[in-house]
């Protein structure tokens, strides 16, 4: 350590070479700073005698206070009376006496530990405290060790530990117990979760969570590992319960990615479950379909490559995995070129797709309108040339291309086995943007646009497997074909007419509205009524985005039919400020028997968090089924947090009712003592003395 610097009102050196400093004494050595009322230094013993109030700070958030002390010259060893150790300006450890050992350990005897604010004018004990015969703080290891520790709420003893070790608040990765949770569920009973975190090394960790209740014995787990060029995570659970007493139940979700050679990225996602109801019974997920996937891809400025395999599993009552496309293989290659001879941009694409159903029945045995065992393979290629011209204020874009495909169908006695196509495409897009600066500083943009498009060839007779559900929105308004996959294409002449108006003002409010309609020479038979694209005249599309300076953002999309009735509507919104964060959505879709949607779909979803004051926060999450006229799920939470404790209560009600799912209610309670690493709540400003919390 470097030389020490001493500052005081009065400094004297006695005849026996002792140094005595009095009045506002400050001593500095390295990062360590000491203040006291008086210091007497004996050079023969190398010891300092200090008179308080004494404060020692090491520059890392550790502060030691005392009434009297005797320390070594480097302040790394010594004895302190009436000591109080403060960690990170939050956790306080008060003791009759303390000793410092080698600048690393601070041993405190007959200790009281709390992070609650203690006021001289408030005679009540702190909300919580840990009393211990001895406490050792390892500053280097960032650990706190307790001997014969007793947890008290106010002055009432609650728990006792012969030995206890907890990390301090600066420690972010340390083996130990995390926040426990008391959980009550209408189906699983009342139970207790106690997570235990194991730091295997700086790059790997494992969390094991025993969950014990009246009706279940469950072990939850999570494993994470980071690599130089990737990461993996596995999470799941294994259960023996009274719901299915003869079965061992469980689930596994795994995912990860790795950067490999030549800019390729390998990604995987595995989703497995023992039975259809397990995820819902234990509130692990609300998914009703699982998709496990592995893919390798590369994205560059003018090139994209992807190869993937997907395995699908349904958890729905009305779906049978044997007649669903359970295995899907896809390969995609896209390339952009900019030929100087032609000008503009040349886009090339090739795609291969194959899916199969486990069933080998080559007809519709279950009567759902789809052949039970149908398998399909297709190969598609596409080449398109695009060029944009500017004629005054008019922007014109031309698109010329050709598309081809080969299709093979097996295990289907009702369809041809092979089919192919080679079709030309062409389009002309016109835009005329107009800009005006308003007197209020806002900028107004009006852009009418129109597209005339044509795709040759005839509609395929192969089954429509991938394009049964079509969305019509602003994103595909000017597409040549609005089917989601190449197994179907729009044919013949079509025209798209619309306009966009925008008001842009970052200091006030901004709004963008787009409206338009598609007109066709011939109706497309594979567009159903819910797509909004059936017939020779599509539904009218109206979409918009609104953003206010105060934090409100709205996005909406609506389709109107010829009678100006709404056939599909979607509205999403979010509003956030310092105290409030609210999000919600509304969706409505008319019935469409052609895609086995025999009822209207209507839903309202709301989630929000409101901070009542600096201590109280309330949250609500709800999903309401408009058609059924009932709530689908509802969840509410309440959090109380001050400088020393965080208490969270959560209640959730699921109204699902089917052969595998039953309505259930769950209640969860978590309690966290602030000041330790296992606390995950945000820091709350300590209350001021003189304002007692009731």
What are these regions (language model features)?
Residues 62-79, 85-117, 123-130, 137-694:
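Outer-membrane beta-barrel proteins and related beta-barrel translocases across Gram-negative bacteria
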Residues 1-121:
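Charged (often Lys/Glu-rich) extended helix/loop segments that serve as interaction or gating elements
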């Amino acid at each position: 350590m470097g030389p020490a610097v001493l500052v005081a009102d009065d400094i004297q050196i006695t005849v026996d070479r002792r140094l005595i400093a009095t009045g506002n004494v400050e001593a500095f050595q390295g990062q360590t700073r000491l203040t006291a009322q008086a210091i007497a230094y004996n050079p023969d013993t190398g010891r300092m005698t200090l008179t308080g109030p004494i404060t020692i700070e090491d520059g890392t958030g550790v502060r030691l206070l005392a009434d009297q002390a005797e320390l070594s010259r480097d302040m790394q060893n010594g004895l302190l009376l009436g000591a109080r150790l403060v960690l990170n300006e939050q956790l306080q450890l008060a003791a009759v006496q303390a000793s410092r050992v080698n600048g690393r350990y601070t041993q405190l005897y007959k200790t009281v530990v709390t992070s609650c604010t203690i006021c001289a004018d408030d005679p009540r004990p702190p909300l919580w405290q840990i009393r211990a015969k001895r406490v050792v703080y390892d500053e280097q290891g960032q650990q706190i060790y307790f001997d014969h520790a007793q947890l008290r709420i106010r002055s009432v003893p609650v728990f006792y530990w012969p030995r206890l070790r907890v990390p301090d608040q600066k420690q972010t990765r340390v083996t130990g117990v995390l926040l426990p949770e008391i959980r009550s569920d209408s189906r699983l009973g009342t139970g207790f979760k106690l997570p235990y975190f194991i730091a295997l090394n700086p790059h790997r960790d494992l969390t094991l969570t025993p969950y014990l209740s009246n009706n279940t014995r469950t072990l939850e787990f999570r494993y994470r590992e980071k690599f130089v060029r990737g990461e993996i995570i596995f999470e799941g659970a294994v259960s023996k319960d009274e719901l299915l007493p003869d079965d061992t139940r469980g689930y596994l979700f795994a995912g990860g990615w790795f950067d490999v050679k030549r800019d390729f990225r390998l990604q995987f996602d595995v989703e497995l479950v023992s039975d259809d109801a397990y995820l819902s019974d234990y509130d692990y997920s609300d998914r009703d379909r699982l998709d496990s996937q592995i893919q390798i891809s590369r994205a560059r400025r003018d090139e994209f490559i992807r190869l993937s395999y997907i395995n699908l599993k349904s958890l729905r009552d009305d779906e049978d995995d044997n007649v669903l496309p359970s295995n899907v293989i896809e390969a995609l290659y896209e390339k952009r070129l900019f030929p100087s001879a032609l000008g503009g941009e040349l886009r090339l694409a090739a795609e291969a797709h194959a899916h199969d159903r486990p069933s080998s029945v080559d007809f519709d045995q279950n009567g759902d309108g789809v052949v039970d065992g149908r398998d399909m393979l297709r190969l598609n290629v596409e080449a398109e040339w695009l060029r944009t011209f500017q004629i005054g204020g008019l922007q014109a874009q031309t698109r010329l291309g050709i598309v081809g495909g080969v299709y093979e169908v097996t295990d289907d006695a009702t369809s041809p086995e092979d089919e192919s196509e080679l079709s030309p495409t062409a389009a002309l897009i016109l835009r005329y943007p107009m800009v005006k600066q308003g007197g209020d500083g806002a900028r107004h943009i009006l852009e009418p646009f129109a597209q005339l498009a044509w795709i040759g060839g005839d509609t395929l007779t192969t089954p429509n497997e991938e394009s049964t559900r079509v969305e019509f929105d602003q994103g595909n308004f000017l597409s040549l074909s609005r089917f989601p996959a190449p197994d179907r294409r729009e044919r013949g002449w079509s025209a798209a007419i619309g306009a966009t108006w925008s008001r842009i003002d970052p200091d006030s409010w901004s709004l963008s509205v787009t409206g338009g309609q598609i007109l066709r020479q011939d109706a497309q038979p594979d567009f159903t009524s819910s797509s909004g694209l059936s017939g020779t005249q599509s539904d009218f599309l109206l979409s918009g985005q609104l953003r206010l300076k105060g934090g409100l953002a709205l996005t909406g999309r609506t389709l109107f039919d010829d009678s100006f009735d709404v056939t599909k509507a979607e509205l999403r919104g979010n509003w956030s400020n310092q105290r409030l964060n609210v999000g919600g959505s509304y969706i409505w879709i008319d019935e469409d028997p052609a895609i086995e949607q025999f009822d209207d779909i209507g839903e309202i979803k709301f989630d929000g968090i409101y901070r009542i004051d600096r201590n109280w926060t309330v949250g609500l999450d709800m999903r309401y089924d408009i058609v059924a006229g009932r709530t689908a799920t509802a969840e509410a939470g309440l959090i109380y947090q001050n400088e020393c404790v965080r208490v969270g209560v959560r209640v959730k009600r699921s109204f699902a009712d089917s052969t595998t799912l039953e309505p259930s209610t769950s209640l969860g309670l978590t309690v966290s003592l602030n000041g330790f690493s296992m606390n995950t709540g945000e820091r709350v400003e300590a209350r001021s003395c003189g304002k007692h919390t009731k």
